[in-house]
A protein has these predicted regions:
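C-terminal regulatory domains involved in ligand/effector binding and gene-expression control
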Residues: 1-88, 93-275
Length: 275
């Protein structure tokens, strides 16, 4: 199997979920062995930040990568689309520290990439082929994420939410570009109304609106769902994005209540062992 890049440029302008700032993003084709590389066009010298697990520096409500003192955060939705569409190499030019949130899902990014087209390159693709059981646990909160050998890419996820409106949700998908676009990419970020003010006081969620976040309270959902189990589908979207920081995965991911911290810890373990 050959490495890939985009066949043409793709661009998107929008608001950052946490920063609340307008950002213009351009996805550009890149040669083999480049990887997925952010280019901060708003900074002097246009520094590059490689989207790899070893560059993860924070997982507070989003995944952050940092290189030589320059960072980009909330990258997981974009990484998820790259992973699902099997794009190995791309320059991501961005004029702020956070990609646009779009509607809180990865669908806009996936469709932009799909419309640009995927181009094969001469070099062989380097997959992270799972050869053993790799697992990260958070025993205190009864959470874990693991990956097993499997000839393909499958994700089985159980989300556990104490709110009666959501409760326990489970989904299990064999990941292909077609299934991802239909069943996972439209799943949006979810927030509890009572948490929003606290997040904003922390400088987070400043760009979140009912156009980009699903909000619920003790009475019910404030805006309509795309899926009855949209929370667990968005969790699957996130883990696909976070694990792409290790490389394209060939294996079966199984997770219970996992978030960015556990996901990226597993990505670091995979990168160190198999990358």
């Amino acid at each position: 199997m050959q490495q890939t890049t985009l066949a043409a440029e793709a661009s998107y302008t929008g608001i950052g979920l946490h920063s609340g700032r307008e950002v213009h993003m351009v996805l550009k084709p890149a040669p083999a062995d480049t990887g997925l590389v952010f280019v901060r066009t708003d900074l002097e010298g246009q520094p590059q930040i490689h989207a790899t697990a070893s560059n993860v520096t924070s997982t507070m409500r989003a995944t952050t990568v940092e290189e030589n003192g320059c960072k980009v955060f909330t990258i997981e939705h974009l990484m998820s689309a790259f992973h699902a569409l099997r794009i190995d190499n791309c320059y991501i030019e961005i004029d702020a520290e956070e990609p646009p949130v779009a509607d809180g899902s990865s669908l806009a990014f996936f469709q932009k990439m799909k419309d640009a087209g995927v181009k094969e390159l001469a070099a062989e693709r380097k997959e992270i082929v799972i050869d053993n059981v790799y697992r990260i646990d958070d025993e205190e909160h009864n959470r874990f994420v693991m990956v097993l050998p499997y000839d393909g890419f499958r994700v089985s996820f159980t989300s556990v939410n104490p709110h009666k409106l959501i409760g326990v949700q489970y989904e299990n998908f064999e990941i292909s570009p077609e299934l991802y676009e239909r069943e996972i990419a439209p799943a949006r970020t979810i927030a509890y109304e009572q948490e929003i003010e606290a997040l904003r006081n922390m400088g987070l969620g400043l760009g979140g609106t009912l156009e980009s976040v699903i909000v619920y309270n003790d009475e019910g959902w404030i805006n309509p769902l795309h899926f009855e189990d949209e929370l667990v589908r968005h969790k699957i979207l996130d883990v696909i994005g976070d694990l792409r920081l290790a490389g394209p995965i060939r294996g079966h991911v199984i997770a219970v209540a996992s978030g960015h911290a556990l996901n990226t810890s597993l990505a670091k373990k995979l990168q160190a062992s198999l990358g």
